Every structure is written in C-alpha cells, then in structure tokens.
C-alpha cells in the first residue's frame, strides 16, 4: 500500500497545511463581503450556460403505468436514492417548453421507464429486473408507434442512472458480461456512469451527475464565513467487507490505500462513520475526497461542488458529468489511483492561489445549479444541461434513418435471463 513519509517530509507537509488553512480562512471571511450572485466573469472557469428552449423538441411517449407510476406508487423510496434522476426527468419533461405533443416534429423521443424503481427490501434496484423492464418498454414503443422502427432508436434517448449505466448491474464484472442492452445500442444514453474505454459507455452518451436532494442540502447550509479548518474530509466505506474484505477489488484498492496510509494522519478527517453533521463538515473542509467505489461516480462529487469543498477525484479514466459545460479541471484536483499513498504531499503542494481560485469558482451559483436536479427545475440546472447536450447533437446525421430493407434490432439477442418477460 506504500510507505509512510519520513518525519522531515511529514513536518514540511504539516507546516504547509497550517499556512494554507490560515490563508483559506482569511479568504472565506473576505469573500462573504465581495461574493456576487451570478455567473462568474472572466474567460476561464465559467459554466457553459445555454438556454435549450427553441433548440430542440422532445416527444414523451405515454406509457402504461406499470412502467413508471405504478412502480413509484409501490415504493416511494425511488424518489430519494441517487438514481432518482430518471423519475424527475420524466416529471420535468411533461411540463417543459421543449416538449411537443406532435411526434412528427420531434427531434428526440423519450421513453419514461423507471428501471431503478423496482427495489429490494434494502432499497437497491433489482439488477435482473431492470433490463427486463427496459426491453419490455422498448418493445411496447416499437409496437405502438412507428418512430422507433424508422431509426432503431437512434433518435431516442434513455436515462440509465445505474452503477454501470445501461449494463444494468452494480458489479463491474457482471455488468461487462451483460454489456449494454442490444436494444439500446443505437440510442443516446444519459447515464451517471462514465469511464473511458469501458464497454458500458458507448460513444455519444451524455454523462450526468447522480441525484442528490437539493432541499436536504440547502437545509444544512452554514455561513460562508465559517473557517475551513479541515484539510481533507471523507466519510464512507474503505472496504466492502461483504463482497471484498481484503479491499483489493473494491475501488481497485484506492479506498483501502487511503485508510492504510492516512488513518492516523491528523490532517485527514476520514472515517466510516456518517455523522449528522456530514454536510456541515464538508463546508468546513478544503478538500473532499471523491474516490471511486464499485463504480467511478458517487453523490460525493455533487455534494462537494454544492458545499464549495474542492473535489479530489480519485478515479482513473472517469468521464465527469457535463464535461463539455463544467470546467472540472479548474475546480477539482485529480489524483491517480496509484498515487494515493502520496495524497498528503500532493494536496499540500497545491499553490494557495490555485486553492483560492478553485474555491471562488465553486462559489458560483451557476456551478452549483449545473449539478442539481431541482424540483421545480431552474435555469441552468442538470435538466437543462441534459437538454443542451441533446441539442448539441442536432441535426441528426443522415445515417440515423434505416434504409428500406435494412436489418433492424435482433430482439432475441442478449443474456437468457434478460430475455424473460417482465
């Protein structure tokens, strides 16, 4: 897992951190009198803000209730977990000005199927039910309207907020074994999972943030003048004792490495305990660790942005949400998984002016809006970022429409269990 730094290095790191904590606290106090609420000025660091209204039209299929509303009525926990964006996206589109009731003028077609709303008693989506729900929904759409069959879904988009997107499994090995459902291979997938060169991320997908309850976070706001007295903060698992007790497979060993190297380091406030003051603590921290787990993404990234805690992203090859609109390189610190043993030195070496710039950018309301699914929606929020991503794909290329006689979907392709009726 690496070696602990020698006493001289540790002392130098501690001294650098002490100076950083003092300077950042002074900046926080000064910022409360100068912060303006609006878009950041300057050439760098802005969130790309576009109004999608008038740039695209979306037709929302009216599906039988068994695909959405009945599932939600059976288990309202679906509205609270980190996969809830697929439900709120449906609600948003129903009243959005981009919605059209005339499918002939639509640029995009949306199928509201709540694949993450069939839950275990513990509140997790059932991985064997989700692909069956999706396949059944696509079959219904193809049999009821002519639009799917014109393109094999190439002008359709689907939300797939599962751990590994449209591979529909929380374990990577099983997700790769399934692969992206064959019926979705031509569709645009809007998903939380994003990792370069991975079979569960197909070209053209739109990577989005997971759902984190905006109202809950707002209820835990503290004064922005509060000193950031915590250098590094993290709460969560380091080992998945049930599935990977040694820690070598879970998070590719990165979380275990954080714990083994820094559990006794006073600069690191890290624990498996999740206190009632979790959100308040993030607002007192300079850096918040955002390591991969079973998948590279988690709601911590959203929480860190909202609370102005510089995200420390430890997830090699991650594709971040709305990367064409949010300047992640300017608001985050990226640490390679193999460099975790040097995490203290790396973070202590970030120049003070860079830390302050990242904090100033994170303080922008536009930055926070872009990662949140508000109810009701707000300009520039995650819903609008999705629409902007879809609008930027227009017009569709000529090859989107199937030629007469061109072979369409093989409805019998896929894993045997996935082909069972739902």
Curated annotation (Swiss-Prot):
Topology with regard to the membrane?
Answer: Single-pass type II membrane protein
Q: What is its EC number?
A: 2.4.-.-
Q: What is this protein called?
A: Probable glucuronosyltransferase Os01g0926400
* Cytoplasmic domain ranges by topology: 1-8
Which residues of this chain are annotated as glycosylation sites? 149
The transmembrane residues are 9-29
Q: State if Glycoprotein is listed as a keyword.
A: yes
Fetch the PANTHER family from UniProt: EXOSTOSIN HEPARAN SULFATE GLYCOSYLTRANSFERASE -RELATED, GLUCURONOSYLTRANSFERASE OS01G0926400-RELATED
Q: Which GO terms describe its molecular function?
A: glycosyltransferase activity
Could you confirm whether the keyword Plastid appears in this record?
no
One GO term describing the cellular component: Golgi membrane
Q: Which GO terms are recorded in the biological process aspect for this UniProt protein?
A: cell wall organization; glucuronoxylan biosynthetic process; plant-type secondary cell wall biogenesis; protein glycosylation
Enzyme superclass (EC): transferase
Compartments where found: Golgi apparatus membrane
Q: Which UniProt keywords apply?
A: Cell wall biogenesis/degradation, Glycoprotein, Glycosyltransferase, Golgi apparatus, Membrane, Signal-anchor, Transferase, Transmembrane, Transmembrane helix
Side Lumenal, residues: 30-422
Q: Which family does it belong to?
A: Belongs to the glycosyltransferase 47 family.
Task: State the function annotated in the UniProt record.
Answer: Involved in the synthesis of glucuronoxylan hemicellulose in secondary cell walls.
Q: Highest taxon of the source?
A: Eukaryota
């Amino acid at each position: 897992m690496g070696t602990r730094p020698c006493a001289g290095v540790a002392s130098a790191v501690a001294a650098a951190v002490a100076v950083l904590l003092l300077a950042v606290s002074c900046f926080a106090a000064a910022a409360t009198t100068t912060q303006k609420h609006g878009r950041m000025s300057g050439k760098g660091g802005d969130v790309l803000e576009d109004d999608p209204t008038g740039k695209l039209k979306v037709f929302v299929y009216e599906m039988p209730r068994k695909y959405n509303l009945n599932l939600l009525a059976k288990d309202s926990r679906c509205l609270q977990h980190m996969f809830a964006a697929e439900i709120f996206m449906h609600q948003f589109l129903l009243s959005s000005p981009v919605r059209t009731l005339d499918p002939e003028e639509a640029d995009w077609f949306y199928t509201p199927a709540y694949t993450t709303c069939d839950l275990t008693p513990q509140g997790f989506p059932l991985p064997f039910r989700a692909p069956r729900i999706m396949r059944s929904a696509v079959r219904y759409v193809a049999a009821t309207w002519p639009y799917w069959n014109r393109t094999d879904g190439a002008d359709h988009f689907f939300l797939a907020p599962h751990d590994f997107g449209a591979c529909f499994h929380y374990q990577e090995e099983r997700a790769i074994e399934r692969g992206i459902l064959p019926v979705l291979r031509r569709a645009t997938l809007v998903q939380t999972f994003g990792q370069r060169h991975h079979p569960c991320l197909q070209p053209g997908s739109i990577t989005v943030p997971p759902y984190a309850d905006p109202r809950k976070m707002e209820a835990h706001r503290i004064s922005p003048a509060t000193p950031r007295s915590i250098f590094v903060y993290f709460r969560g698992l380091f080992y998945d004792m049930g599935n990977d007790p040694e820690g070598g497979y879970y998070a590719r060993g990165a979380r275990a490495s954080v714990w083994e190297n820094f559990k006794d380091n006073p600069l690191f406030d890290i624990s498996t305990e999740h206190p009632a003051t979790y959100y308040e603590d993030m607002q007192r921290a300079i850096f918040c660790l955002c390591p991969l787990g079973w998948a590279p993404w988690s709601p911590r990234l959203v929480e860190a942005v909202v609370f102005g805690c510089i995200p420390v992203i430890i997830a090699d090859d991650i594709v971040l949400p709305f990367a064409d609109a949010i300047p992640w390189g300017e608001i985050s610190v990226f640490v390679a998984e193999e460099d975790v043993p040097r995490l203290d030195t790396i973070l202590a070496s970030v120049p003070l002016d860079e830390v302050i710039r990242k904090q100033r950018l994170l303080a922008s309301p536009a930055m926070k809006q872009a990662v949140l699914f508000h109810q009701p929606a707000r300009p520039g929020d995650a819903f609008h970022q999705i629409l902007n991503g879809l609008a930027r794909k227009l017009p569709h290329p000529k090859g989107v429409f199937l030629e007469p006689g061109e072979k369409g979907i093989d409805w019998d392709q896929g894993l045997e269990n996935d082909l069972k009726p739902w």
